[in-house]
Amino acid sequence: SSVSYTGQTARQVLIADMAYYMQNILVEDTAVPVEDKVAAMSFFIYGTDADVADTLIGTYIKDSANVTLKDSATYGDISTGKNLHKKIAGGDGEGGGETSRLIDGEFFGWDEGSPTLPIDLVNQWIQKQAELASDGVATIVVDATGASSAAHVNVDAHGRNYRQLMQKFLMGAVNFSQGTNDYFMTNFIGTNSEGINYIAAQDGTKSYTYAEHKFDEGFGYYGAARDGMDYTDLEARAKSGRDEYKNGYHDSNGDGMIDLRSEYFFGHSQNCAKRDAGSASGPNPTDFSTEVMIPILAARQILSNAANKANPELTEAENTKMQEHIHHASVAWEKCIAATAVHYVNDVLNDIA
């Protein structure tokens, strides 16, 4: 296959596993030092020794007892040397990473602690969450009826859920940023240091060209199964549907295993399916999943056709058409994120009504 984005899959798993850890493993425990909890959560950001660390997804994937995951026991089995801090918009805080990917060099939206970079906010939230899980005091929440109860350890006195904040923030600051503001912005008609067109230049000894690989890495951050158009929205969101599809994955190549690199819905792609399914019976149904996938597939076909010419070349006209597809996919992806934010706002309004 000329398609590969294993590094992106590893990062999808790091984010998903972090959310699972915070929701299901992290508990209020004064006997465990704050710094130990910070280290446990920071692992998912910095990926220290991740190559030999066990993934958690095999525990929480739907119908886990009947699923065999392909080469996914450790993060290194999926892709070696991966982390999130080197891919977050604005860089790693030490001058490295994606320092040029913070649009206009400006980060705003969170006043507490005055974080100057996204990574600063991530570290701040980890510290806050660790302290919250170590203070021995349960957060009490009061619902719209006046009833009170102890909140989950992720929730602070202001009602802020750090698991949700971390997961959704990283999906934007890493996945959406990298997908749309990095890989999809590759100069696909450029040339390498040897003067070879990117559409013709092999990426090392791999079976794909440089241009194809960069595009596929952008798709990897969206997170859909490669045959995502074969799924219904309810299947992609792992809600219901045909037995072989209803859990958000499908053994497409019939090898008896689920390959997270190609046969599973992560992150943004699953959220798009949720928005589409949730709006299907309303007056203004959305189809974000199709609006993202169709132009991505069309753009990838243009690259494939160009790479397989007798003399590989991406013409100006072909690149212009491909850029139109990339634009449409990126805008639909962003609209899906906005719709998800509105969905949660509506949830809050319903809860307090």
Question: Where does each model-flagged region fall?
Answer:
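Mature extracytoplasmic or organellar-lumen-exposed domains after removal of signal/transit peptides
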Residues: 1-353
